[in-house]
Amino acid sequence: QFGLDVKDCGNLSGPANPWQDAVNGFRHLPEVVQWNQLLHEAMYAELQAGRLPIMLGGDHCLGIGSISAVARHCREKGKKLRVLWFDAHADFNTATLTPSGNIHGMPVACLCGHGPKELIEIGGHSADRPALHPKEIRQIGIRSVDEGEKRLVHDMGIEVFDMRFIDEMGMRHAMELALALVDAN
């Protein structure tokens, strides 16, 4: 009807959540790494095949695998990248900033090179050459950020359109600013 060729690639299968306490500041790191590696490979394969992959469901930490695949693809094709991160939270925590060790509060930090090596390096990225640079991300709808996390987001220079901005200026204006300078490349 819309001229789209939709392909359901099914579900990924990975390790179960072991429900354990944090180890060295990270909860379930081996399992999170496995899931993100699986997702990265699946997303990257679809991008290489010329398709636009859409992932439905999952924990916020899976943004590491999906976005690192898009970042890798864009880098290889010489394309610019802009990530719109719609969330109430900045997800820019690190093991030193949060006592919980929950990696679902860390994906943006990991994508920007601040996190465990195993997650930063998915897709061939590194702390020196992260999947994302702060100028490539816009955070939209943020309303609840830990104090240390807030300082780190500010220090990194990430552009944030928090709920106060949206309430005062409107979502349309926030999106116009977030998408400014986006072109066909």
Predicted feature locations:
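Conserved alpha-helical scaffold segments that buttress catalytic/binding sites
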Residues: Q1-N185
